[in-house]
């Protein structure tokens, strides 16, 4: 008898058999790209080895070895776990049923399998315990549903199947699996999973397809797509479509395993470009191969989501028939069944495709309708190809679409549904081209179509009274705005040309104009929509890169606005756009900048051409209203102000001036540095005031300090008094961007920064921070631009680069080396993209050769990845790939 004392068989030979078998499968897969065959053949290879080892171990005839889970259904991916159950006869429990010799033998068996190279996940259970575990855990029950016999007692396996079949309750199984799916979707909906989705678990992943088949099998409708087609749940064309998308996802998952050399189901940034190259996907500038691969994935996932939703609704209707639902006729095309909208006849959309848009309107106009029946949704999905050029030209259809945009409720929900089922992309072909298109610009975390619909959703949210507390100004403005559907149209088209060669704003306005003209919109409305699409980045760029306290900046911006209606529309679109890129991009400081720009421009447009709130005398008066000084204090304030020129008063608002005056008017010639802090008015961030005898590297020292404590400088205002003192103010954000600050935080900054400025020790060279994986795989080409400003008094230094810790310190130290003085700084971070603007002066700026050297040094410190040395390239000179913007 074989067993522990039998002559051991050569596990090394078995290990080599497994290794060579897997290598052969990998070679064959890369030759024929047949994923289904690989999964099946890999399962077969492992089956043979497990049977051989089970036989050699001479396991008792009363036991059985089962394959379960994905391996059980013969879909074994290259590095997936091999899930097994050792089935024991019912003798109390598994521990009781397993005598000492069997326990030792199983322990030896598990160790042997690991030595051979099989990553197994195993459990030892009796038939009764399998039933109990399955009853308590839907995941266990689902895994055991896939069980098949590998070796051992077939009668025991039959008993196991009977128990599993007896306890399978289709209704409970459906409810549990649906809840499990909802929880999984919620878990994988976070932004990182959108950028790096899990092919198996994310919404639209392989698990969503398996879920449909598990429920179908539990209800007795079949366990394959062809069986579901035979039962009439889907048509054969749809079965082929599902199979095709399943193949796409399986292929990507197989390649991920091989590329990573391990079980890897996430499309990490590290793998996106290599996978694309392996699949022969070429770049189509400005889009990288990885972005095109991800569009292929997102479109497959979208199809899977469609199938999953429709089939689960269909199965629900079969498993939970609602025979008592009251039916009310709405018109000759639609009826209300219960609280769902239902088509009266199955082919209504084929006979009248316009009814697709009518169904959208009916859902919006009837609050008592909670959704569509499975038959309506399925017919809508199947009829999407009927939306053709002639459909789009039909005046009735154009009128209905515009009516959809005008509805006071349900717009966001219906636009998202129209996108999910292919309606929106067919009605607006330009929108169809950006579905599933990723944007690796380091601040968008959504695909272009998701971002666009998020922008529309943000605009709609401003309309809702229950959310008015979030953005009171935006809520008031949009509720007073005539024809808000024009804003929604601008939102739909603002990024619609992303991914094409050329300026997406200019290309998008062409699409927008074509749409408006096809829908016979008035010229005035068309002009506004087209103008918004063309200028949708203008307000954000002005607020974040220019000094909006400068009257000339406001005047120039106001001139580009045309009128107050254009300004209001652009403000609402800009706030919605920035908020729709990523939860991390929007913050209170950006909101305050945009709001200040809006108010100042609005005043200018309304005839206050002197910009009363910005004028010097008016500012002084407002400061005095805040301070209420007596005569002695007034004299001190006047002395303090006499040491400041008009640029200081223009640069700071009255509250800032009052704060500075309070702390500095009695200490104008302080021998020691003065550092004061307070919570920012925006609710996030800390305002820091620094007053000290001026020194050439002061800005760099302050940057170095905040870099050392992981605070981000988002704004700097630099001023030198007539007495030679630096009066600098900063807005900084802590690493966690909290709104409620501990007083000890303020005390720490004041004490530590004062000490650092007093010591004037040599600054350490900033160490390049660790890059995020996103930035490492999708680096931003640094851009540097140095141009004189309109006044001729300063130069504007604009920098774009990938953000990382220490970046501002490195920039500041370069400026010190070249003898430049920083007068103001706008530090704008969009996700992981830094767009910084500095107002500088220095003698070298009039020398073109020196400026080129400055640009080259800045490019060098801005690079986010190690720069390989190029033969023949002189040190300090930018390479051809670097962008120095010509003057």
From Swiss-Prot:
What PROSITE patterns does the database record attribute to this sequence? ACT (PS51671), HD (PS51831)
Stretches assigned to the HD domain: 448-570
Cited InterPro entries: ACT-like_dom_sf, ACT_dom, HD/PDEase_dom, HD_domain, NT_sf, PII_UdlTrfase/GS_AdlTrfase, UTase/UR
Keywords assigned by UniProt, alphabetized? Hydrolase, Magnesium, Multifunctional enzyme, Nucleotidyltransferase, Repeat, Transferase
Cofactors (names) = Mg(2+)
Region span, Disordered: 864-887
EC number, as in UniProt? 2.7.7.59, 3.1.4.-
Xref: Gene3D superfamilies: 3.30.70.260, cca-adding enzyme, domain 2
Per UniProt, residues of the ACT domain are 687-772, 796-871
The record's region (Uridylyl-removing) falls at 330-686
Region Uridylyltransferase: start-end pairs: 1-329
Question: Care to name a GO molecular-function term for this sequence?
Answer: phosphoric diester hydrolase activity
Quote the record's activity regulation: Uridylyltransferase (UTase) activity is inhibited by glutamine, while glutamine activates uridylyl-removing (UR) activity.
* Pfam families per record: GlnD_UR_UTase, HD
Query: GO annotations under biological process?
Result: regulation of nitrogen utilization
Q: Which reaction does it catalyse?
A: [protein-PII]-L-tyrosine + UTP = [protein-PII]-uridylyl-L-tyrosine + diphosphate; [protein-PII]-uridylyl-L-tyrosine + H2O = [protein-PII]-L-tyrosine + UMP + H(+)
Question: In UniProt terms, what function does this protein have?
Answer: Modifies, by uridylylation and deuridylylation, the PII regulatory proteins (GlnB and homologs), in response to the nitrogen status of the cell that GlnD senses through the glutamine level. Under low glutamine levels, catalyzes the conversion of the PII proteins and UTP to PII-UMP and PPi, while under higher glutamine levels, GlnD hydrolyzes PII-UMP to PII and UMP (deuridylylation). Thus, controls uridylylation state and activity of the PII proteins, and plays an important role in the regulation of nitrogen assimilation and metabolism.
Q: Which family does it belong to?
A: Belongs to the GlnD family.
What does the comment on domains in this protein's record state? Has four distinct domains: an N-terminal nucleotidyltransferase (NT) domain responsible for UTase activity, a central HD domain that encodes UR activity, and two C-terminal ACT domains that seem to have a role in glutamine sensing.
Protein name, UniProt field: Bifunctional uridylyltransferase/uridylyl-removing enzyme
Organism encoding this protein: Nitrosospira multiformis (strain ATCC 25196 / NCIMB 11849 / C 71)
Lineage here is: Bacteria, Pseudomonadati, Pseudomonadota, Betaproteobacteria, Nitrosomonadales
Q: Could you tell me the gene encoding this protein?
A: glnD
């Amino acid at each position: 008898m074989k067993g522990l004392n039998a002559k051991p068989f050569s596990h090394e030979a078995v290990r080599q058999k497994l290794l060579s078998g897997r290598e052969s499968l990998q070679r064959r897969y890369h030759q024929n790209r047949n994923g289904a065959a690989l999964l099946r053949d890999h399962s077969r290879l492992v089956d043979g080895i497990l049977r051989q080892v089970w036989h050699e171990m001479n396991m008792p005839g009363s036991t059985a070895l089962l394959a379960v889970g994905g391996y059980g259904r013969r879909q074994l991916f290259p590095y997936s776990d091999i899930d097994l159950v050792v089935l024991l006869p019912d003798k109390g429990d598994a521990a009781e049923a397993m005598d000492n010799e069997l326990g030792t033998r199983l322990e030896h068996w598990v160790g042997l399998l690991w030595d051979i190279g099989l990553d197994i996940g195993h459990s030892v259970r009796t038939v009764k315990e399998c039933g109990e575990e399955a009853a308590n855990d839907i995941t266990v029950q689902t895994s055991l549903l896939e069980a098949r016999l590998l070796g051992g007692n077939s009668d025991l396996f039959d008993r196991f199947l009977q128990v599993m079949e007896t306890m399978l309750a289709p209704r409970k199984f459906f409810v549990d699996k649906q809840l499990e799916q909802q929880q999984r979707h919620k878990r994988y909906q976070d932004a990182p999973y959108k950028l790096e989705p899990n092919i198996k678990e994310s919404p639209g992943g392989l698990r969503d397809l398996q879920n449909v088949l598990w429920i179908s099998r539990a209800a007795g409708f079949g366990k394959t797509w062809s069986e579901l087609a035979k039962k009439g749940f889907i048509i054969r064309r749809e079965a082929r479509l599902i199979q095709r998308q399943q193949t796409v996802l399986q292929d990507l998952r197989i390649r991920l395993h091989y590329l990573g050399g391990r079980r890897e189901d996430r499309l990490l940034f590290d793998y996106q470009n290599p996978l694309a190259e392996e699949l022969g996907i070429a770049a189509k500038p400005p889009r990288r191969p990885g972005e095109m691969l991800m569009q292929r994935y997102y479109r497959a996932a979208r199809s899977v989501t469609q199938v999953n939703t429709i089939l689960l609704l269909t199965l629900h209707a079969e498993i939970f028939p609602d025979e008592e639902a009251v039916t009310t006729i709405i018109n000759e095309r639609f009826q209300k069944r219960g609280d769902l909208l239902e088509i009266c006849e199955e082919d209504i959309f084929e006979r009248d495709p316009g009814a697709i848009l009518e169904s959208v309107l009916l859902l919006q106009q009837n609050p008592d309708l909670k959704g569509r029946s499975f038959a309506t949704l399925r017919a809508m999905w199947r009829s999407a190809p009927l939306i053709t050029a002639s459909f789009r030209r039909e005046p009735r259809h154009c009128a209905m679409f515009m009516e959809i945009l005008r509805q006071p409720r349900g717009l966001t929900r219906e636009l998202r549904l129209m996108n999910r089922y292919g309606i929106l992309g067919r009605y607006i072909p330009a929108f169809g081209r950006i579905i599933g298109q990723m944007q690796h610009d380091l601040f968008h975390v959504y695909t272009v179509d998701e971002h666009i619909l998020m922008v529309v959703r943000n605009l709609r949210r401003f309309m809702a009274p229950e959310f008015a507390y979030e953005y009171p100004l935006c809520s008031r403005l949009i509720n007073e705005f005539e024809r808000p559907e024009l804003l929604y149209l601008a939102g739909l088209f603002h990024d619609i040309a992303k991914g094409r060669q050329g300026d997406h704003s200019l290309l998008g306005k062409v699409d927008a104009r074509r749409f408006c003209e096809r829908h016979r919109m008035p010229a005035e409305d068309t002009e506004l929509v087209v103008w918004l699409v063309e200028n949708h980045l203008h307000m954000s760029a002005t607020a974040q890169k220019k000094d909006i306290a400068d009257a000339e900046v406001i005047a120039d911006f106001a001139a580009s606005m045309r009128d107050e209606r254009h300004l209001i529309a652009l403000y609402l679109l800009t706030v919605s756009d920035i908020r729709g890129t990523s939860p991390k991009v929007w913050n209170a400081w950006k909101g305050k900048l945009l709001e200040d720009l809006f108010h100042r421009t609005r005043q200018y447009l309304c005839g206050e051409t002197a910009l009363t709130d910005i004028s010097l005398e008016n500012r002084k008066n407002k400061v005095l209203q805040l301070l209420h000084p007596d005569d002695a204090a007034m004299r001190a304030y006047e002395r303090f102000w006499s040491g400041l020129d008009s640029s200081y008063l223009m640069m700071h608002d009255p509250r800032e001036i009052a704060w500075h005056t309070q702390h500095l008017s009695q200490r104008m010639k302080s021998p020691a540095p003065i550092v004061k802090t307070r919570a920012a008015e925006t609710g996030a961030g800390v305002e820091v005031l620094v007053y000290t005898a001026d020194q050439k590297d002061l800005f760099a020292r302050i940057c170095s300090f905040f870099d050392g404590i992981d605070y981000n400088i988002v704004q700097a205002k630099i001023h030198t008094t007539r007495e030679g003192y630096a009066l600098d103010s900063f807005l900084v954000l802590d690493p966690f961007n909290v709104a409620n600050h501990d007083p000890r935080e303020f005390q720490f900054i004041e004490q530590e920064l004062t000490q650092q400025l007093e010591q004037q020790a040599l600054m350490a060279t900033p160490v390049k921070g660790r890059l995020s994986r996103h930035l490492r795989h999708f680096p931003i080409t640094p851009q540097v631009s140095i141009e004189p400003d309109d006044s001729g008094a300063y130069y504007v230094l604009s920098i774009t680069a990938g953000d990382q810790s220490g970046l501002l310190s490195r920039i500041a130290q370069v400026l010190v080396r070249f003898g430049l003085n920083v007068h103001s700084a706008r530090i704008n971070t969009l996700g992981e993209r830094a767009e910084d603007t500095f107002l500088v002066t220095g003698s070298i700026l009039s020398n073109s050769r020196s400026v080129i050297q400055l640009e080259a040094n800045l490019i060098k410190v801005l690079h986010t990845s190690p720069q390989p040395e190029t033969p023949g390239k002189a040190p300090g000179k930018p390479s051809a790939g670097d962008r120095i913007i010509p003057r």
